[in-house]
Structure formats: structure tokens, C-alpha cells
Amino acid sequence: MYQIEFKEEAFLPRERLVEVGAERLSNQELLAIFIRTGTKKEPVSILSNKLLNRLESLAALRELSIEELQSLTGIGRVKAIEIKAMIELGKRINQSELLLNERILGSEKLGRKMIHEIGHKKQEHLVALYLNTQNQIISQKTIFIGSVNRSIAEPREILHYAVKCMATSIIIVHNHPSGSVQPSRNDLLFTENLKESCEKLGLVLLDHLIVGNKDYYSFREESDVILKFIDNIVEEVFFNLTFTVE
């Protein structure tokens, strides 16, 4: 008797998807379709609910590791891998839709896009977007992921792909895992260095964005502040050199 009830419950979300469409299903029902089956003690609906209740928000699902998923009763290694694959595929579909013939019209639109993509990352990620003469994104590359041994990307890595895809301009985006989007001294110096390197190759650095989990900072929008800061750095370096000579 139990097995018959179990099978009926497991297939119910699938039947509802066919009847009313995927967009009408709850998060629990969609997740239950991927988990597929429950255990002898708990049906799949309970398992999917337990997983969702463990999260602060649905977006936090993408942060769970395979091991963390496996720690839930009823989710083995295969199911955990399938869930991770489902999340990654969804992210790539969303990214490809945004990327397809997308034209960069402003820092805010791009900032919101990149908050969604890398704002939640626990390691620093630096992403380069390469654009054509119509300001359409023709390629997006993750150039750098922070590690214990390395925390700075090199301009040559960014420019290599620019030449390869024949881009005319570049936008750089990186996240601050701390959540603060204020640029550091290294961020400012890196931006100026990259800008000069781009100019030598006839490329335009359109913007450098810093994103957190809720907000973004645009170097282009804050250009006056950046220029003043760089001028102060140059003056400070000049003063130190003069002082050393004396």
C-alpha cells in the first residue's frame, strides 16, 4: 500500500507540470521532480521541503556543495551531482540569454547582471566582457579566481582574449567577497595599469565594476573620484622619491 501512495506522490509534480506548465509549480514541486524519489520514512515532497527550509533563500541553493547536499537524508551522491548540474545549467541558460546580442546600455544594467552571477561568490572572481564596435558583448571570460597563492590578475591575461576575439573594448568586473564594493588602492592602481595597457593596443577600457551581493561600484560613474585618487597616489609617490633623494 505504501509503495502505491509513494509512486503517486512522486509523479504528481510531473503531471502538474504537463497540465499547468513549469512556471505554475512551486519551488518544492520543481525540486521534487529532480530528487524523484523519497525514502521509506519520508516522501519526496518532505525531502524537497527539508532542503528548501535549510536555505535562507532559493539563491543559496547554488552555494551548497555536493557533500552538503548529501548530508540530507534521502539525497545520495548521484542526486547531489544531478542537482548541482541542474543549477549550473540554469545559470548558463540565463547567462546565454543575457549575452546573446546584448548591448551594453549602462553600468546599472550590467551591475545587476554581474551581482547575480558573481556577487555571491566566496572567492574573488575577475570577469572580462569583450565588446564589438556596436557595444555588443561578443565574449565573456572568467580570467581569474582568487587563491591563497595568488590574488591579482595580470593585464596580459585579459588582453590575450581581447585580441583573440577581435574586441574593440573591454569591461572588467570583479567581486569583493566581503560585500563592500568600495575600491581598494590595488583596485585603483590595477584599473589605471589596465587602461594604459589597453590604449597601447588600441582598445578601450569602458568600465571596471566591483560587485558585492547587493550593490555595485562603477569606475566610469565615479570617474572624477578615481582621477583625483590616482593623482594623489602619483603625488605621494613623487614626494617619497624626492624625500629619498634628499
Swiss-Prot record:
Gene3D superfamilies according to UniProt: 5' to 3' exonuclease, C-terminal subdomain, Cytidine Deaminase, domain 2
GO biological process terms, semicolon-separated: proteolysis
Sorted UniProt keywords: Hydrolase, Metal-binding, Metalloprotease, Protease, Zinc
Motif (JAMM motif): 174-187
Pfam families registered for this protein in UniProt: RadC (PF04002), UPF0758_N (PF20582)
One function term, GO molecular function aspect: metallopeptidase activity
The family this protein is said to belong to: Belongs to the UPF0758 family.
Protein name: UPF0758 protein SSU98_1084
Native organism: Streptococcus suis (strain 98HAH33)
